[in-house]
């Protein structure tokens, strides 16, 4: 009997153990995110003509290594802003538009599992992004990118803009994952309606709430991820939406396990407690594929249900990874064609120009753009900001690559009607972001922020440098001893005529600014957002770089010089202060 009892006990124990093994298991998943690639596919800077660190060709080496470790348990996602940046995407978008889009081919080659649309994927215009959407093979996500007539409607996949999906579904080792993609709804503040005709952009918190509910009811997933082309917080905030709403969604919309995000070109890897007291990982790799964002998820599953989730977020630097030579060989013809394109000769400069000089007063770089804007539009006044932190165009032959350094974005060129007072207030708003109020000769002249030196859009300043507008066509002084809102004194028109704050002027600017970008026209000049369209006198049908290029071609030889139409005062204080700030920013 004892022997039988022992045998029976052993058999029962073995049966229970086998059942436990069958009903309980651990699954490990890995997710890798890229974001704000901006055409940084290959390890070559087509603008500067030199090697690049990072880029997708290096990231792909790391990704393939992780795929070998993880097998099918790896999810690769991209967070948008891929269609504008390096000249290779401009070449694909506009020079050879009949061919399959290069960005689509790169996404397909790397076998991404999902992609969210970014604002710089909308800016190239319907012809470009509609074709790109058709050519990308993985799900393209945009839960808040809806057909015009469907804004703020129910959660219905039929309401989403043609070719996009609100979310994607992925099964990994029996685990069901849903990825919700959203785009910052601030597009109308930057882009003319013609660029996004037929589309509306919903506020993110409300949109996330309805789609989480829909997914929980219809998909019953084990994990819900966000893939948001929207920064952590801040930016443009209106009564209708917040530009950077990732933190708000993480806090206010229960259901998310992880939110992968981007748009703000900053590294983030942190936890946020939502309104139910649960922790949500939010993670952002920043831009240009210097890093990837990685999440490792270990799930304990019992009886087919997830009973525990361990999540770890990591920012992985890929700047010095080995280049994926197979990927390079696959795209070598494209690389050679882009090099030939950017090598085209446009004209000749008799002297070099430097963007860095734009932060300290009149500069030949910024004033060349001002002068060309006035030539093209015949406006009275030009407004523009430095679009690069530290670029140089050397004297001698000017190539197409130099034109991308001169003007980095595919903005259109606009002319608006503005009163003299609005012009002054616009400039006040700009210089308030740009400069400090000095109370002693030892103060900073510029509004600097040590914490932003690694931020690719602030680069050591407190505010975005692409909002530092100066003006041409008027002579003025900026007094750094005056308080905000009282620094700018306009002396006269540059042609010698009086400047009148009550008079209407024709003012040239780019499309980003003309549509309210940076809020200089709205918060600064005081023009209501819904009145901006009525102020438009003229706009180009092609990007500004195209017209700047054509003007330089016509001129042949250009001798760029500062206009000397404005300056910082009092000079006894600001000159030494600017030199100190120059050393802090540039080291010399």
Question: Which stretches of residues belong to each language-model region?
Answer:
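Bacterial Sec-dependent N-terminal signal peptides
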Residues: 1-25
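Acidic, metal/ion-coordinating pockets
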Residues: 21-320, 360-372, 382
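Catalytic centers of hydrolytic enzymes
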Residues: 22-30, 34, 39-49, 53-68, ...
């Amino acid at each position: 009997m004892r022997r039988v009892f022992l045998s029976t006990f052993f058999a029962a124990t073995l049966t229970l153990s086998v059942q436990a093994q069958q009903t309980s298991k651990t699954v490990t998943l890995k997710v890798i995110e890229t974001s704000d690639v901006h055409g940084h596919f290959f390890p070559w800077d087509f603008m500067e003509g030199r090697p690049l660190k990072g880029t997708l060709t290096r990231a792909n080496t790391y990704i393939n290594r992780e795929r070998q470790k993880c097998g099918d348990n790896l999810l690769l996602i991209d967070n948008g802003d891929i269609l504008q940046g390096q000249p290779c995407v401009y070449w694909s978008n506009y020079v050879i538009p009949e061919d399959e889009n290069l960005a689509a081919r790169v996404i397909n080659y790397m076998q991404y599992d999902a992609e969210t649309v970014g604002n710089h994927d909308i800016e190239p215009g319907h012809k470009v992004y509609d074709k790109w959407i058709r050519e990308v093979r993985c799900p393209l996500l945009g839960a808040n990118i809806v057909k015009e007539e469907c804004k703020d409607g129910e959660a219905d996949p039929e309401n989403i803009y043609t070719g996009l999906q609100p979310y994607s579904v992925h099964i990994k080792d029996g685990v069901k994952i849903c990825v919700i993609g959203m785009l910052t709804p601030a597009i109308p503040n930057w882009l003319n309606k013609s660029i996004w005709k037929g589309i509306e952009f919903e506020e993110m918190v409300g949109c996330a709430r309805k789609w989480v509910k829909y997914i929980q009811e219809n998909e019953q997933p084990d994990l819900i991820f966000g893939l948001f082309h929207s920064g952590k917080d801040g930016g443009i905030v209106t009564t209708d939406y917040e530009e950077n709403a990732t933190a708000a969604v993480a806090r206010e919309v229960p259901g998310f396990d992880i939110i992968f995000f981007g748009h703000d070109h900053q590294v983030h890897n942190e936890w946020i407690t939502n309104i139910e007291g649960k922790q949500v990982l939010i993670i952002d790799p920043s831009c240009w594929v210097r890093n990837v964002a990685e999440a490792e998820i270990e799930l304990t599953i019992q009886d087919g249900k997830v009973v525990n989730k361990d999540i770890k977020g990591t920012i992985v630097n890929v700047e010095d990874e080995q280049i994926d030579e197979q990927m390079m060989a696959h795209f070598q013809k494209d690389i050679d064609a882009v090099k030939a394109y950017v090598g085209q000769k446009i004209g000749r400069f008799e002297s070099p120009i430097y963007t860095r000089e734009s932060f300290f007063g009149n500069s030949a770089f910024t004033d060349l753009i001002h002068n060309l804007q006035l030539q093209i539009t015949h406006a009275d006044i030009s407004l523009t900001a430095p679009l690069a932190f530290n670029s140089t165009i050397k004297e001698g032959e000017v190539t197409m690559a130099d034109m991308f350094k001169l003007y980095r974005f595919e903005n259109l060129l606009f002319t608006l009607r503005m009163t003299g007072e609005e012009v002054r207030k616009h400039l006040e708003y700009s210089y308030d972001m740009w400069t400090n109020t000095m109370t002693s000769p030892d103060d900073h002249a510029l509004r600097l922020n040590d914490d932003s030196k690694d931020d690719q859009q602030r680069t050591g300043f407190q505010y975005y440098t692409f909002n530092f507008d100066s003006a041409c066509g008027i002579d003025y002084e900026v007094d750094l001893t005056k308080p905000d809102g009282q620094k700018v004194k306009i002396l006269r028109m540059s042609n010698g005529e009086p400047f009148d704050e009550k008079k209407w002027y024709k003012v040239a600017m780019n499309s980003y600014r003309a549509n309210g970008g940076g809020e200089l026209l709205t918060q600064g000049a005081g023009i209501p957002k819904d009145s901006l369209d009525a102020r438009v006198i003229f706009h180009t049908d092609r990007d500004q770089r195209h017209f700047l290029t054509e003007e330089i071609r016509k001129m042949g030889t250009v001798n760029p010089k500062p206009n000397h139409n404005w300056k910082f005062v009092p000079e006894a204080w600001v000159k030494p202060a600017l030199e100190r700030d120059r050393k802090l920013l540039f080291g010399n």
